[in-house]
Amino acid sequence: SDEIENYSAKQIYDRAEYEMARSKPIDAIAFFSDVERLYPYSEWAKRSVIMQAFANHKAKQYKEARDAAERYIEYYPADEDSAYAQYIIALSYYDQIEDIGRDQEVTAKALQAFKKLIKNYPDSEYVKPAELKFDLAFDHLAGKEMEVGRYYLKRQQFPAAINRFRTVVEDYQTSSYTAEALHRLVEAYLSMGLVDEAQSAGAILGHNYQASAWYKRTFSLLRNEDLSPAVKGTGWLRKIHRQVLKGRWL
């Protein structure tokens, strides 16, 4: 409004902070925007941009939060709050991650944004929480692959199931789903009569997760067929096993 133009940058900024303290982020955003608009090159404007990112995120206005955070990084790339701005960008995606059954594009974007934070701001205080959330988002994507793989397995669409479980083993090997993925591969390969592949998947599972319930199930599954875990053939599982022996896998 015209009236707002009569106030100093600090006065408007203080009003915005007052609204934040009252848990009214939408009202605060309007005042932070006024500071940026009326006093564009001031220190208060700089603070207002990062606070717009924060307030929009509080208000669950994720796109607006990202826009403000990206603007901050563009204007002040060397500033100490740039790491926080990048964290807000990552959080704006992360906080939209839904159940495993939903589309995972937003999860992939969260991973990219966390990766960028860890790479560009390695000494930042936000690296630790970013790494933790990265691992959770990474697990989430692996969970999606597992869900689809189980769906195909249940319907005896074995090649389609194998493709999903293979993706978990190759691309999400540090996730919490890898042991199950290897067991499901044993199930699917045995169902198709691909004995070498089933034994190979069982051997990798035994090498890395010998104490797990999944390995016990695999071992008894193979034993029922008079088989044992052993790397056979020349396929993709042999390559994985070679990496295991060299300590390059898991």
Protein language model regions, located:
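Acidic, polar-rich low-complexity tracts and alpha-helical solenoid repeat scaffolds
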Residues: 1-250
